[in-house]
Swiss-Prot record:
Organism: Streptococcus pyogenes serotype M6 (strain ATCC BAA-946 / MGAS10394)
Principal location listed in the UniProt entry: cytoplasm
Gene name per UniProt: leuS
Record protein name field: Leucine--tRNA ligase
Reaction catalysis annotation: tRNA(Leu) + L-leucine + ATP = L-leucyl-tRNA(Leu) + AMP + diphosphate
UniProt entry tagged with the keyword Nucleotide-binding: yes
Length: 833
């Protein structure tokens, strides 16, 4: 039996593509464009795992498909190469993180090339290249000039072990850091912030313009968290102090019986009485040790301390005790809430715990038993009594504004973006702080501000980054003799990834971020494929920067990514014991089709789980390519199931994909290829072209491969294969298995040219129609014959054909035919006696 040798074929075609620059981006202005983007990887020391190629294969199939359809295709790859692991490695080993990063990139690139992806490597970007981060810094200076980058003393999530602050999104629900699992404490520090909140409404509105999964849009909507309500001002009794509360339910103000401030609220110390001072100070200290996520956990027991002061409810003059509690965050809203315990579960629990008044102001429910959180007509609410929710809100806002104690207000949950990191391995923030108290941005002519090479990569000990140790870089003197100090914080890893898709469009431009005409030609990105874990942060940050650049006239579109697709996760083979604990694969043996723990003998259940080093179930693509070939890996990952589903890796599935490709190879290389069309494959071939074309366009790659299999099965039943159908089929399979596609194309054409730009096959609609149908002939209700006849034969013709059939003749000879019922295209029923 013939098998193809992937170890010879694959390197041969990879060399051909590289030598001939086969995938250089097309520049013919008369052609339509297609920009296919992958989320570029962080080049870790571990290299690629089999999860990476799933998304990369999808965009590669689309890119090859669109090239064949006559598009200019931009399909680039690059490296998101700043980040903590390289810095940690440098601190542990004393080596330069740049060298470590370069080695990792070389390894990633080798692995990617071995998979036959059609990237245009002339457009490769690397976020750690000064020629790249010059423009990251340039964008920062523009944000600074527009007042969108500012310094603030903010409570940050400080991780002592990492020597840096981390963003809210990087804190796990248990209050530890996502990276390393270290304790996180709240600590006030001078930080750079980006004013993403200035774009909140546009970030929300423009989600309507993009073709993204609704689930991702919802996550962004929730993160932005728009709410409409009112600000209400409360005076503090016997003082000249007041504070403002934002509420979405100003109509419930008559039911506000106490107020709660965040422990960090600026007013707390000023209004705390001497009796309560010690308890308040102690509580503030405890709150500072908790992350925002831990503080707002709904399940935790409510804690709080009274300040000793009272606020005056503006609508009824009632006194409301003012408490502090850690579930109120200084960074959210105004850092103060009015509590309506009758109609809010958290307020109700707090009121019950500390014996505070509960006054119902909405009809329905028993507030002694539980908070009533549904809608009802207003009661105990003076001029609002009897009104429904909408009417009462409108009337209360009108009253607040007339009395000068409040106003209508729209707020967002979105916070400004904490942009600085106390790390070495990141883009230097191009700002100089002068001894006269002013700060200036580094002028564009002096960009890039290059990260200094240093052996001294260790925390400075002051909370500043290791750059504070590099004094000859740090200290500068202006022409007028004024001394200055460079900013020591660096940018987060999110910075370089917020605009990389723009640099791919014009990666070698030294004068500007990218040429306007090229940006007009290529934007927006037509398809962006990557993991759903980036749903909020990366995508929101990139959209924010894009909108700023749009306002500056740098980019021509409001949105960067027209269509987004999240591939599923490839899960590893893993096993669970009776307690539900996962067991590493090297501790498992298979006996008689069941799995057992090597040490305890306990029978285990097979359960797919995320691939991880600890479970020893990470599959390295190098091993798969060596054993089965890159084309097999590509076809298998696309055939596993829908692209957005999470599916377990299977060796059997891999073997099945390889067997299929061997059958394809045999079909084209051993079947007699003829210039004469017998017509036998007309229907299945045209169906295959139609189905594969439509399904690739819709990214339904698994069903496209299934249809290719249908064609192979049909073609194998014929003695000969029509040359045009053989070529068309090879073109259809080439985006999935490009090395094999090229090899078989040469076997059929000997053209010496790549298959990549051969026009995509078309189909003949008339051949999709069945010209023949199978009908059954029943005698006495039993099927006696099956006949293939021309479609749409009349009743009379059908009856004639059926009665002339040999098998039918044998059944009816010597019998009386009572009646013949003929149903066109279906059956003939003969009644005899």
């Amino acid at each position: 039996m013939t098998f193809y040798d992937h170890t010879a074929i694959e390197p041969k075609w990879q060399a051909f593509w590289a030598d001939n620059h086969t995938f250089k981006t097309g520049t013919d202005a008369s052609k339509p464009k297609f920009y296919a983007l992958d989320m570029f990887p962080y080049p870790s020391g571990a290299g690629l795992h089999v999860g990476h190629p799933e998304g990369y294969t999808a965009t590669d199939i689309l890119s090859r498909f669109k090239r064949a359809q006559g598009h200019n295709v931009l399909h680039p790859m690059g490296w998101d190469a700043f980040g903590l692991p390289a810095e940690q490695y440098a601190m542990d080993t004393g080596n330069d993180p740049a060298e470590f990063t370069a080695e990792n990139i070389a390894n990633f690139k080798r692995q990617i090339n071995a998979l036959g992806f059609s990237y245009d490597w002339d457009r490769e970007v690397n976020t750690t290249d000064p020629n790249y981060y010059k423009w990251t810094q340039w964008i920062f200076t523009k944000l600074y000039e527009k007042g969108l980058a500012y310094e603030a003393e903010v409570p940050v999530n400080w991780v002592e072990e990492l020597g840096t602050a981390i963003a809210n999104e990087e804190v796990l629900p248990d209050g530890t850091s996502e990276r390393g699992g270290y304790p996180v404490v709240r600590k006030p520090m001078r930080q750079w912030m980006l004013k993403i909140t200035a774009y909140a409404e546009r970030l929300l509105e423009d989600l309507e313009e993009v073709d993204w999964p609704e689930s991702i849009k919802d996550m962004q909507r929730n993160w932005i968290g728009k709410s409409t309500g009112a600000n209400v001002t409360f005076k503090v009794k016997d003082t000249d102090k007041d504070f403002t509360v934002f509420t979405t339910r100003p109509d419930t103000l008559f039911g506000a019986t106490y107020a709660v401030l965040a422990p960090e609220h600026a007013l707390v110390d000023a209004i705390t009485t001497a009796d309560q001072a010690e308890a308040v100070a102690d509580y503030k200290r405890q709150a500072s040790l908790k992350s925002d996520l831990a503080r707002t956990d709904l399940a935790k027991e409510k804690t709080g301390v009274w300040t000793g002061s009272y606020a005056i409810n503006p609508v009824n003059g009632n006194e409301m005790p003012v408490w502090i509690a850690d579930y109120v965050l200084a960074s959210y809203g105004t850092g103060a809430i009015m509590a309506v315990p009758a109609h809010d579960e958290r307020d109700w629990e707090f009121a019950k715990q500390f014996n505070l008044d509960i006054i119902p102001v909405l009809e329905g429910g028993n507030v002694e038993e539980a908070a009533f959180t549904e809608d009802g007509l207003h009661i105990n609410s003076g001029f609002l009594d009897g009104l429904d929710k909408a009417s009462a809100i409108a009337k209360m806002v009108e009253w607040l504004e007339a009395e000068g104690v409040g106003n209508e207000k729209v707020t967002y949950r979105l916070r400004d973006w904490l942009f600085s990191r106390q790390r070495y391995w990141g883009e230097p923030i191009p700002i100089i702080h002068w001894e006269d108290g002013t700060s200036t941005a580094v002028p564009e002519s002096e960009l890039p501000l290059v990260l200094p090479v240093t052996k001294d990569i260790r925390p400075s000990g002051t909370g500043e980054s290791p750059l504070a140790n590099v004094t000859d870089w740090l200290e500068v003197t202006r022409e007028d003799g004024v001394k200055g100090r460079r900013e020591t914080n660096t940018m987060p890893q999110w910075a370089g990834s917020s605009w990389y898709y723009l640099r791919y469009i014009d990666p070698h431009n030294t004068e500007k971020l990218a040429d306007e005409e090229l940006l007009k030609q290529w934007l927006p990105v037509d398809i962006y494929v990557g993991g759903a874990e980036h749903a909020v942060l990366h995508l929101l940050y990139a959209r924010f920067w894009h909108k700023v650049l749009y306002d500056l006239g740098v980019v021509p579109t409001k949105e960067p990514f027209q269509k987004l697709f999240n591939q599923g996760m490839i899960l590893g083979t893993s096993y669970r014991d009776s307690r539900g604990a996962l067991v590493a694969t090297d501790k498992v043996e298979k006996r008689d089709g069941s799995f057992f723990h090597v040490e305890t003998g306990e029978e285990l259940e097979q359960a797919p789980a995320k691939m991880s080093k600890s479970l020893k179930n990470v599959v390295n693509p190098d091993d798969v390519v060596e054993q089965y070939g890159a084309d097999t890996l590509r076809v298998y990952e696309m055939f596993m199931g829908p692209l957005d589903a999470s599916i377990a890796w299977s060796e059997e599935g891999l073997e099945g994909s390889r067997k299929f490709l061997d059958r394809v190879y045999r079909l084209i290389t051993t079947k007699e290829i003829t210039e004469e069309n017998s017509g036998a494959l007309d229907k299945v071939y045209n169906e295959t072209v139609k189905a594969v074309t439509e399904q690739v366009d819709q990214m339904k790659f698994n069903t496209a491969i299934a249809q290719l299999m249908v064609f192979v099965n049909a073609a194998n039943k014929e003695d000969k294969l029509f040359s045009d159908y053989a070529k068309g089929f090879v073109q259809l399979i080439a985006p999935f298995a490009p090395h094999l596609g090229e090899e078989l194309w040469q076997a059929l054409t000997a053209s010496g040219e790549s298959i990549s730009y051969v026009p995509w096959p078309s189909y003949d609609k008339s051949k999709l129609v069945e010209n023949d149908v199978e009908i059954v002939v029943q005698i006495k209700g039993k099927v006696k014959a099956k006949l293939v006849v021309a479609k749409d034969l009349s009743r009379e013709e059908l009856q004639e054909v059926a009665l002339a059939n040999e098998k039918v003749q044998a059944e009816i000879t010597g019998k009386d035919i009572i009646k013949v019922i003929a149903v066109p295209n279906k059956l003939v029923n003969i009644v005899i006696k």
